[in-house]
Amino acid sequence: VCGRQLPHKDANPLAVHARNFNYSSKSIVKSKADIEKFGIKTVFMSNSFAAYRRSVFEELSGFPEHTILAEDMFMAAKMIQAGYKVAYCAEAVVRHSHNYTPREEFQRYFDTGVFHACSPWIQRDFGGAGGEGFRFVKSEIQFLLKNAPFWIPRALLTTFAKFLGYKLGKHWQSLPLSTCRYFSMYKSYWNNIQYSSSKEIK
């Protein structure tokens, strides 16, 4: 189960919209039966504010030993596959947000692309993120038009940075290791990486 995250008081308009978009005021419980309806959002989870039933966590071997990020999504996906349910509790609230620069968003989405490249079974079983990404951009522009129109150029630049970072991350094995480390937000991840066409974390 994960709770609701609200933006910090000093959050910029992009950070405010991101939290409003991803963390609604309505609680929900999702299971394998919801995959067709929610797609990859079925396994949305955030370790910034989450708890796992220990018995189930240990039954499914816990978090993967070597993943660049999104171990929370990984575990939620394993739980759904095993027939368990995951919950979002909107009544449990914390403040958590980041005022990322376009460069930092590029790095974060590069790492997200690496994660999906190394765990392709998640998108294979739950669907891709393209549709959700388009819905996010549309919602963001509408939010900014109403609340902070001068931030729209920054939003467009950030969207391009995310897209480029994600696409490069999905094809990280075609890049020099030094380039991957430079593009990545989590530099230490690359210390023990070896190239492999079959490298998949499951």
Residue spans of the language-model regions?
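Conserved donor NDP-sugar-binding/catalytic core segment of glycosyltransferases
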Residues: 1-17
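Active-site donor/metal-binding and catalytic loop motifs
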Residues: 82-106, 115-120
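Short, flexible active-site-adjacent loop segments at beta-strand->alpha-helix junctions, enriched
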Residues: 4-7, 27-29, 48-49, 92
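Non-catalytic, C-terminal membrane-associated alpha-helical segments of glycosyltransferases
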Residues: 111-114, 118, 122-202
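Short, hinge-like loop/turn segments at secondary-structure boundaries
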Residues: 16-22, 104-107
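A recurrent flexible, glycine/aromatic-enriched loop bordering the glycosyltransferase active site
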Residues: 31-55, 67-68, 74, 116, ...
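A short, conserved alpha-helix in the catalytic core of glycosyltransferases
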Residues: 50-52, 56-61, 66-93
